[in-house]
């Protein structure tokens, strides 16, 4: 399983991103990650959280990261978010879900010109990387998200962070929630669970 949290703010978002992601810690026990975008571009931190909680592992990163846009995740499988450079531009991506037909999609990707995927421990393909590759098969991020959702057998919710903003997509059949909250200061967030943003002063 896992969970994710994203923030779009006119000011620095790192505080809200840190705690919003941390509030999803009960959904995963292996990896945690955050990416922010600001004047210096993308900044990312990923840590193993198997032997120490998210908050402890990321407290030093929070002091160094700066940005008004950010996404974070708790993952029970692969390290993420990933930062991708493609014909669609640079973006960071985080996913929650399961791809049942991953082998067929990888085989099709090789047939259509994708040259390689990075293997994780155990020989598995990173499903977040595969999702990014599917998105990149189209001419825009929204079209790519719709395409990925149409060919994935399973359930895949995702957050994409670009220099312009955040794309949030619930899985095609609505099995997993994606909720949007608004703060009185105008900041917006997207979350896997509403209590995570309620604790930060965001409203439904």
PLM features per residue range, with description:
Residues 1-204:
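Conserved short alpha-helical segments that host acidic/polar catalytic motifs at enzyme active sites
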């Amino acid at each position: 399983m896992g969970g994710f949290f994203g923030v779009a703010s006119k000011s620095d978002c790192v505080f809200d991103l840190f705690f919003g992601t941390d509030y999803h810690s009960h959904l995963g026990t292996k990896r945690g990650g955050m990416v922010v975008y600001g004047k210096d571009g993308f900044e990312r931190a990923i840590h193993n959280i198997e032997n120490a909680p998210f908050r402890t592992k990321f407290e030093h990163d929070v002091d160094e990261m700066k940005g008004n846009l950010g996404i974070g995740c708790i993952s029970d499988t692969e390290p993420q978010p990933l930062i991708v450079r493609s014909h669609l531009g640079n973006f960071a991506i985080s996913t929650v879900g399961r791809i049942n037909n991953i082998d067929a999609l990888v085989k099709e990707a090789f047939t259509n010109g994708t040259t390689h995927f990075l293997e994780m421990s155990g020989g598995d393909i990173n499903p977040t990387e595969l999702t990014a590759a599917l998105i990149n098969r189209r001419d825009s991020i929204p079209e790519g998200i719709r395409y990925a959702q149409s060919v994935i057998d399973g359930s895949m919710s995702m957050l994409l962070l670009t220099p312009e903003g955040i794309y949030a997509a619930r899985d095609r059949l609505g099995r997993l929630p994606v909720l949007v909250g608004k703060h009185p200061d105008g900041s917006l967030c997207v979350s896997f669970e509403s209590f995570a943003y309620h604790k930060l002063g965001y409203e439904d």
